[in-house]
Each structure stands twice: as structure tokens, then as C-alpha cells.
């Protein structure tokens, strides 16, 4: 039985609590927040604490779902005794802090996971299988919603675009060149377009908008053999294959990814990893993601 705690009881923290109820062989022993949320302790039949040391002393694993600017502080506290730590994305936005986290993680052999949930999106996982023997020429991401009043301690690059940067790295590998532009309002980036040139020659284009009336999550992929159009919200995937026969018409097939809860799958994977030796290979990818986000910000603010 793994004793787990949740640090941060905002919207994302509560989402984690709801999903932890559906995972076997864990015990939710403590929830922590600076603001009193005792009603949540009663609802989830656990202990509420305003003392982070209580959390540290009693947990085998913890989930940090606090504002981004506090991630580093809570990681330092939790890493004193806890060996399994899950932190919502982005891990941090400061490169020096990221390097310090890597150093501590390696020295103390901490199992550290970062909440890039789209890797667990069933549509993305199905696309990954479809692309197994297919060379990608181009990736096109569009991610929009109306989060203008919700993004407070960062901007859309680290809040929204980082998801698609992660998927670009996941599907097509390292990036060698970045070109970006965007719209700023009151020193915050509200709209951004970025082109990433990968080392394997694939070109990724990402559009992110935090002030759009319509919520969109799409991924369009051009490969040597076909064109794939995916809706990450509805799980619909349309595959258009080139017809090399006598007929000029291309062949089109529509499929749907299974209806799975991405956050639940992500948390199950984290709990499973708590029982194994630390494997933090993905931290290198997340570090590259942070570097890319910083470069995109730099280019937009310099324009």
C-alpha cells in the first residue's frame, strides 16, 4: 500500500483527488494547502494539513499541483524525505531551478514525474501506433480556449503551447531551429505561432490562443504515405491514404480512439513507477521543452 499525499487543492489538485479514488493499493493520507480546505478532507476521508512537514514525514509519494511559481519550493521541501514526486507541468520555468532539480533527483535517486498529460491522451497513443512505420514530414497543432483570466503566474507558452511542444518531441524528436511570433497584451503573451524544425527534417507548426471563443485541440500530420487529421477532444482520427493505383481518388478511413481518462492513466503509471527503481529518462525531454519555451518567449518579446 503506497501512502500518497496531494499538495495544492486548486482545480487541478481536486482533479487528482477525484482520480486517486479510482486507483487500487494506495492510501490517500494527507492533503495540503495554504488555504483551509477541510471540507475536502471530509469528502475524501483523509487528513487536511497546513503544515508541509506533516506531509513530508508520512508520505511514500506526493502530487504537487500548486501554482507553477511554487513548484521549486515544494519540490525542495518534499525531496528531503519523499522518493516519489509527481509535479504538474510545467515543472519550472527557470533553467537554473530545472538544473538544480535534476541534480537533486539524481543525487537522491528520486522518482520524478511531470504532468504532460497529452502523452496519455488515447488519441495520441493511437496515432503513435499508426505512425510506427511512417516517416513524418509535417506536424500541425492548433490549441485554443478562453483562459484569459485563468493564466496568472505564467503565459500561454508554458501553460498551453508546452503540451504541443512535448507531443512534437514525442512524435518527431529533437529540434534544431525555432521561429516564433505572437501577440502580447499587458506584458502577457495571448496568441503565439511557432515553427520548429526537427533534426530529422520534420517541420512542426504550433498555434496557441488563450482568448478564443472556441475550444480547439487538433493535430494534423503529413507523412510519406498518408495524411492524418485528429481531433484530440472528440477522439476522431481521419486517415487519408495515397492511392497509387489507377484511380486518382485517395482512400479515406475514419476511426475513433478508445474513451479513456488520460489523467487516471497518467496517475496509474506514476503509482506503478513508485514500485520500481527510478527511471527519469523523460526529464531530459522536459528540459529541452523548457529551453524551447524560453526561446519562443524570447523571440516574441523581442519583436
Q: Where in this protein do the model-derived segments appear?
A:
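C-terminal helix-rich "cap/oligomerization" subdomain common to oxidoreductases
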Residues: 61-66, 110, 199, 269-303
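Hydrophobic residues in well-ordered beta-strands that form the structural core
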Residues: 86-87, 112-114, 230
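C-terminal glycine/acidic-rich active-site capping loop/insertion
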Residues: 117, 223-284, 299
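Contiguous beta-strand/loop segments that form the cofactor/metal-binding neighborhood of enzyme cores
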Residues: 159-236, 264-278
